Structures are given as C-alpha cells and as structure tokens.
UniProtKB/Swiss-Prot annotation:
Residues 1-23 are annotated as: Disordered. This is E3 ubiquitin-protein ligase RNF125. Interacts with UBE2D1. Interacts with VCP/p97; leading to recruit RNF125 to RIGI and promote ubiquitination of RIGI. The gene is RNF125. The C2HC RNF-type zinc finger and the linker region stabilize the RING-type zinc finger, leading to promote binding of the RING-type zinc finger to the ubiquitin-conjugating enzyme E2 (donor ubiquitin). It comes from Homo sapiens (Human). Gene3D superfamilies: Zinc/RING finger domain, C3HC4 (zinc finger) (3.30.40.10). One of its GO terms (molecular function) is zinc ion binding. Residues 43-45 are annotated as: Interaction with the C2HC RNF-type zinc finger.
C-alpha cells in the first residue's frame, strides 16, 4: 500500500512510526505488505476500507480525515467518511503469520499489535507503540442498532437502509447540546444530508436543500406573525 505520512495538518505521526518510516526510506528494497497501514506504518488494527479502496487502521483513518479535510492520506481522493470494516482483510490476517521484524518471533498478523506492545526489542528501538488519538464521536444506528462513528452514519444508512421509511429519532441530534431529538421523525437520510452534512457533496440533492430552506423561512414567518399578534 505504501508508506505515506500525513503532514498537511502540521501534526506529526507517532515517534515510533517516524523512525520506522525513515528506516524504510533508506532501504528501498524492503517490501511493504498489504497488511501495513499507510498512516502509522504498523500492521493493520481494526482495518477499514475507504471508498477509494485503500485500507487503514480504523483509528488512523478517523484521525487523519479530521486533520486533513476529508482526503485519503494515501491518494488524496475526497472521502465522505472513514469507510466500512474491511472484513475480508481482517479474516485473512487471522490466518497469516509473519516474523516480528525486531525479535523474529512468528506471530499471527491479527495479534501483531498486541505482540509489539510487549516486544522488548521493539520498545528499546522505537519506544512504546503509540496509537493515533481517536477523536470521532460514536452513535448508534436507529435502524439496526450498530455502533458507528458519527461521520459514518450517512454512508451506512445509504448503503444498508436506503429503503427504510419508518420514523426514527436522529442519533446525531442527541450529541448536540440543547438539541431536541424528538423533534425529528422523517426520512433519516434526508435529515442527515440537510442538517448534519459538511462534506457530503456527492450525496446532496439540492432540491432537498431548497425544500428545507423554504420550510425554515415559512416557520420563521409564522413565528414572527405569532409574536406580533401577541404584542398587539
């Protein structure tokens, strides 16, 4: 997949990742497997696949998207969300084995992160493994009760619940202080596009935006009329 460090935000990768990146660049023949994350340069942990097809650690891509204005840290393609779990990769990792680069112990790839956290040779060389901070808030899909990152909810609903018509409460409204989630009971996808969208240009129907604006203008006019009537 390549080893690409994200520096647009001015925030550096963990020290251990930086050290390994410099070492790999000095040795161009060192192979980088498809199980390496291009952000932290370690074996994948909870792999997710982005819309552009690249696979990263879940916490790495979530943090990278927040810091780099929603672009893929590998190919710079626009991404509306962190992607979906790469279950095929996770399954393969459970049956693949690799020698630890530092102590040469044969380790299952799905357990490699746990191994290097305690590998003394790794710690002596790079310091303790540092995971990128995971800052995205989490919510629960009201249709299937799956726990998601808030930025993945729209993608998830479009993919799995496009035909749903039953009224539900918006889980993102519950995350906003002083917001009343009981005030919403319409199409969740439309509501997310209109009320909770910052970078979902590919999914936006501008007719929906126009409807929402007209509705807001009418609501404001009605409120002004009621207030005026009460004062006269």
């Amino acid at each position: 997949m390549g080893s690409v460090l994200s520096t647009d935000s001015g925030k550096s990768a963990p020290a251990s990742a930086t050290a390994r990146a410099l070492e790999r660049r000095r040795d161009p023949e060192l192979p980088v497997t498809s199980f390496d994350c291009a952000v932290c340069l370690e074996v994948l942990h909870q792999p997710v696949r982005t819309r552009c097809g690249h696979v990263f650690c879940r916490s790495c891509i979530a943090t990278s998207l927040k810091n780099n204005k929603w672009t893929c840290p590998y190919c710079r393609a626009y991404l509306p969300s962190e992607g979906v779990p790469a279950t095929d990769v996770a399954k393969r990792m459970k049956s693949e084995y690799k020698n630890c680069a530092e102590c040469d112990t044969l380790v299952c790839l799905s357990e490699m992160r746990a191994h290097i956290r305690t590998c003394q040779k790794y710690i002596d060389k790079y310091g303790p493994l540092q995971e990128l901070e995971e800052t995205a808030a989490r919510c629960v899909c009201p249709f299937c009760q799956r726990e998601l990152y808030e930025d993945s909810l729209l993608d998830h609903c479009i993919t799995h619940h496009r035909s749903e018509r039953r009224p539900v409460f918006c889980p993102l409204c519950r995350l906003i202080p002083d917001e009343n989630p009981s005030s919403f009971s319409g199409s969740l996808i439309r509501h997310l596009q209109v009320s909770h969208t910052l970078f979902y240009d590919d999914f936006i129907d501008f007719n929906i935006i126009e409807e929402a604006l007209i509705r807001r203008v009418l609501d404001r006019s009605l409120l002004e009329y009621v207030n005026h009537s009460n004062t006269t």
